Amino acid sequence: LAHGAPHSALAATFVAQGIAVVSVSDNLADVLALLDIQDRALARKVPVIVGAACSPGMTGLLVHHVTRAFDSIDEVHVAVHGTGGPQCARQHHDSLAGVSIGWHEGEWLQRPAGSGRELCWFPDPVGARDCYRFASPEPVLLQRIAPSLQRITARVSATRRDRLTARLPML
């Protein structure tokens, strides 16, 4: 399913018909619903792959690779910059208005999205950007990949205007 969220309703229909599903959704609520469907699909032996894009997706592959390359890893922090089109921009906008989740010492923490400014460095030409918590499924999916992690966070670059207008409808 390579379209804007939500994917869960269509995925449930496909699973009921025995059709495998691969989702690129990066919407937190949608991914949580897809994970519920995935658990039911396993009983029917229908594959459901959640988080098959860049973020989430490629990040999970990198974490899996790194956990095999090092003796131990305690923390993973993901930072994202930029958008790739109108749907992506809308998701970026909406994700700053919701609730952010993070994994901390074996517990799920919920914090307001758009809070917790942290300076993150990206490769040139992007450079340093202020990044904030956002409603991302990354911590949920990464915790499933590497349950031994103690801390998992996800942040997105945003301007003051992004944060100020996040709770308003996107035009």
Label each PLM-derived region with a short phrase.
Residues L1-A12, V24-L32:
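N-terminal glycine-rich "phosphate-gripper" loop used for MgATP/nucleotide binding
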Residues H3, D26, G51-S55, C131:
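Glycine- and other small-residue-rich loops at beta-strand/loop junctions that grip anionic moieties
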Residues T13-F14, A41:
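Generic structural signal for hydrophobic
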Residues S25-V48:
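Rossmann-fold NAD(P)-binding glycine/threonine-rich loop
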Residues K45-G84:
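Adenosine-phosphate binding glycine-rich loop
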